[in-house]
Amino acid sequence: MANILHIDSSPRGDRSISRKLSYEFITSWKDTHPGDTVTYRDLGHNPVPHVDEPWIAAAFSSPESHTPELKTAIELSDTLIDEFLAADRLVFGVPMYNLNIPSTFKAYIDQIVRAGKTFTVDANGYKGLVDSSKKVLIITSRGGSYPPGTPYAAYDYQEPYLRAILGFMGLTDVTFIHAESLNMGEDAREKSLAGAKDAIAQAVANW
């Protein structure tokens, strides 16, 4: 029995492709793994705050020294980190905005990437503290296409960043399913969506 953390980051509702696809995966997964539990967070409709000065002061000082203001500033981060660490598997629905991730998802990442919690640093450099056995599935939606080996690959700041920041915390078992070319004509859109749905079915069977 596994605990899955499912996060959507699109502010769009029923029109969101990443939401529809992440929901399709979770629904199919629950059908075939009825004993698993799913914790859901909707960052698109319920965003977490960006880090601010009190947050930074709290993150880089001992809890024993925290004033009531600092305790309040870091409380949500502690909750999000506990939730993140408690999950055996992570499923993220992430649209591409301006070649990267939505600011809602970046704010979430900034809340959970914390020294002493999800990474540490010593004389040898940085080391992730998150259990590397956790699996991550990231389902994206993209208007364009950024195939490796083409000039357009340089525009993809979404997948490389997510692989880097997850790896920074210790997570290396990361799978991407891209629904792309969504703004490149109906034929390209339908072909890509069909491919993404096939990949989701494969992930349900093999992930």
From Swiss-Prot:
Its EC number is 1.6.5.-, 1.7.1.17. PANTHER family: FMN-DEPENDENT NADH-AZOREDUCTASE 1 (PTHR43741), FMN-DEPENDENT NADH:QUINONE OXIDOREDUCTASE (PTHR43741:SF4). Pfam families: Flavodoxin_2. Binds 1 FMN per subunit. GO terms for molecular function: electron transfer activity; FMN binding; oxidoreductase activity, acting on NAD(P)H as acceptor; oxidoreductase activity, acting on NAD(P)H, quinone or similar compound as acceptor. It catalyses: 2 a quinone + NADH + H(+) = 2 a 1,4-benzosemiquinone + NAD(+); N,N-dimethyl-1,4-phenylenediamine + anthranilate + 2 NAD(+) = 2-(4-dimethylaminophenyl)diazenylbenzoate + 2 NADH + 2 H(+). The gene is azoR. Belongs to the azoreductase type 1 family. Its cofactor is FMN. Quinone reductase that provides resistance to thiol-specific stress caused by electrophilic quinones. Also exhibits azoreductase activity. Catalyzes the reductive cleavage of the azo bond in aromatic azo compounds to the corresponding amines. This is FMN-dependent NADH:quinone oxidoreductase. Homodimer.
